[in-house]
């Protein structure tokens, strides 16, 4: 980021762990004042304390509009909003309870919509909204119907928001990571057969680190990306060029991780 980014006000949802935490650290390191918002109050508070003042923490459930509205009201005007909140489950379409499908969509898509709704109101002119989609938005992943559908929806939501927010020069983009070393991917990456299959189909031959994603988000939030909006940036070592691992073949082993 450039010096002009110093003292910008940033909000990171899902910022207490994994990719969200790496992004919060990166923004703080670039001189932004960061609010970490997460369902896990204790974790968010601990992370904000780790960053030190003037950074802050707030509790939020992105599926509950009232808590998102209260969060944005308390934080005030913003320059950057990064939405990373999400989770996944696994199962065959014909066996998955509708409630489990809805739960993933509620967080990963509906929650992202609610965050975007209030970000569009609260961001200053020239601000930046970045969401985290997934490789699943591009490659069909048997066994991950809910997550894949939600993340594909988020990719299109990003482009629609980019058009709607453009009159105020608010840029809306997303990053689309592949497998990254985080708690979210643990159920997949700790099954050797799945991990080997994934790496064999990843041209750069490695998993991502949270900082790989954070670095891309920092760029999208910076003045260097001032002419970039509506972009969904593939960030997966080239995995989107090949195929997704066969999750269904290893469901039993994944459930035990």
Where do the protein language model's features map onto the residues?
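Active-site loop immediately N-terminal to the catalytic Tyr-X3-Lys motif
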Residues: 94, 139-145, 167, 205, ...
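Short C-terminal tail/terminal secondary-structure segment
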Residues: 229-257
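Residue(s) in the substrate-gating loop at a strand-loop-helix junction
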Residues: 134
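Active-site helix of classical SDR
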Residues: 116, 150, 158
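Substrate-binding pocket helix/loop in short-chain dehydrogenase/reductase
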Residues: 92-93, 100-105, 198
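Alpha-helical segment proximal to the catalytic Tyr-Lys
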Residues: 121-122, 163-167, 226
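C-terminal helical subdomain
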Residues: 174, 193-228, 235-237
């Amino acid at each position: 980021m450039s010096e002009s980014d110093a003292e910008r006000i940033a909000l990171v949802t899902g910022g207490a762990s994994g990719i969200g935490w790496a992004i919060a650290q990166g923004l703080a390191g670039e001189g932004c004042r960061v609010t970490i918002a997460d369902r896990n109050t204790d974790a968010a508070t601990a992370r904000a304390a780790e960053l030190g003042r003037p950074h802050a923490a707030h509790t939020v459930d992105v599926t509950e509009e009232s808590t998102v509205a209260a969060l944005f009201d308390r934080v005030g005007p913003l320059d950057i909003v990064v939405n990373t909140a999400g989770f996944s489950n696994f199962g065959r379409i014909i066996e998955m309870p509708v409630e489990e499908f809805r739960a993933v969509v509620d967080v990963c898509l509906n929650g992202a919509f609610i965050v975007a709704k209030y970000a569009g109101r609260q961001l200053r002119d020239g601000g930046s909204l970045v969401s985290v989609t997934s490789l699943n938005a591009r490659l069909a992943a048997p066994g991950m119907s809910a997550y894949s559908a939600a993340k594909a929806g988020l990719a299109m939501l990003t482009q629609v928001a980019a058009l709607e927010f453009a009159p105020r020069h608010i840029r809306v983009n997303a990053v689309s990571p592949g497998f990254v070393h985080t708690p979210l991917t643990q159920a997949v990456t700790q099954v050797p057969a799945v991990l080997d299959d994934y790496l064999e189909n990843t041209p750069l031959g490695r998993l991502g680190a949270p900082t790989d994603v954070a670095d891309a988000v920092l760029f999208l939030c910076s003045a260097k990306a001032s002419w970039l909006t509506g972009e969904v940036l593939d960030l997966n070592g080239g995995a989107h060029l090949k195929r997704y691992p066969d999750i269904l073949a290893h469901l039993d082993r994944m459930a035990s991780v």
